[in-house]
């Protein structure tokens, strides 16, 4: 059993460990069996260490799965997401507007989530008033040039948002300067604030956010995958609660 112990039982499928042990014992009883088994172990070890595309894909799937399992068992995450969804329902019932912002992939998420409200998710229903602050290139470049890039979202809120509206800010790190500036402005104006982020510590967020949703990961693409899942879940819930029984 020495060669098998050296390689580790991980070379066998989880449901085949007993058979692997039996087979290795049979091989070891034969003349030259230990050398044969040792060679097989080396082949398996070399194969498992190769960066094959399929192995790479499975590794990323496993990362994704582990993060979602953590979210599913973290009551702080699940409760906060549903609190955000309830706040959005109440805000729309008061004829408020939902704003979203972010940079790069988070900007794309902001636009995606806003569209789920304006167009539809599953049901035919009236459009809901949501807007991503990332789409007007003339506005973005003018504010960035005339003021600073830090103000590209806050300045738009100054023009469009009113007390009782909501802002969902998206930043995997939680430290994007223009996102934080938008949250600060919104907080001062009585606009409810939400941050979607990764597993990072940003103390200021406790002062400027009504809700902080932390995905339990520091890996940017995995965080973004979770953010769009959260956005979809919120959009589906809001649509069902406001229109599911009426239409």
Locations of the language-model features?
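Acidic, divalent-metal-coordinating active-site segment for phosphoryl/phosphodiester hydrolysis
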Residues: 1-7, 174, 178-181
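Glycine-rich, charge-decorated loop segments at or immediately adjacent to ligand/cofactor-binding or catalytic sites
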Residues: 196-214
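Glycine-centered short loops/turns at secondary-structure junctions
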Residues: 95-96, 164, 190-191
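Mg2+-dependent phosphoryl-transfer enzymes with acidic/Ser/Thr/Gly-rich catalytic loops
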Residues: 1-52
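Short, well-ordered beta-strand core segments
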Residues: 10, 27, 167, 193, ...
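Glycine-rich, small/polar surface segments that engage phosphate groups of diverse ligands
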Residues: 86-161
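A charged, well-structured terminal subsegment
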Residues: 40-51, 159, 221-247
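Generic N-terminal amphipathic, Lys/Arg-enriched alpha-helix
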Residues: 52-76
């Amino acid at each position: 059993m020495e060669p098998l112990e050296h390689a580790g039982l991980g070379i066998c499928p989880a449901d085949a460990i007993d058979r692997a042990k039996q087979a290795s014992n049979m091989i070891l009883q034969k003349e030259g069996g230990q050398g044969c088994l040792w060679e097989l172990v080396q082949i398996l070890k070399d194969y498992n260490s190769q960066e094959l595309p399929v192995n790479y894909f499975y590794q990323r799937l496993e990362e994704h799965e582990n993060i979602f399992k953590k979210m599913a068992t973290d009551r702080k995450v699940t409760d906060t997401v549903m609190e955000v969804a309830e706040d959005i329902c109440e805000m729309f019932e008061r004829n408020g507007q939902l704003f979203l912002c972010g940079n790069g992939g988070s900007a794309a998420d902001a636009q995606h989530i806003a569209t789920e409200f304006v167009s539809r998710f599953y049901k035919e229903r009236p459009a809901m008033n949501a807007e991503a602050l990332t789409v007007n290139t003339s506005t973005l470049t003018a504010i960035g040039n005339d003021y600073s890039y830090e103000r590209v979202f806050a300045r738009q809120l100054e023009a469009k948002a009113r007390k009782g509206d909501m802002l969902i800010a998206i930043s995997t790190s939680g430290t994007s300067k223009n996102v934080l500036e938008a949250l600060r402005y919104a907080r001062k104006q009585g606009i409810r604030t939400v941050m979607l982020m990764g597993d990072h510590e940003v103390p200021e967020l406790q002062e400027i956010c009504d809700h902080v949703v932390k995905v339990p990961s520091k890996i940017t693409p995995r965080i973004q995958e979770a953010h769009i899942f959260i956005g979809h879940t919120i959009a589906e819930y809001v649509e069902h609660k406001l229109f599911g029984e009426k239409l």
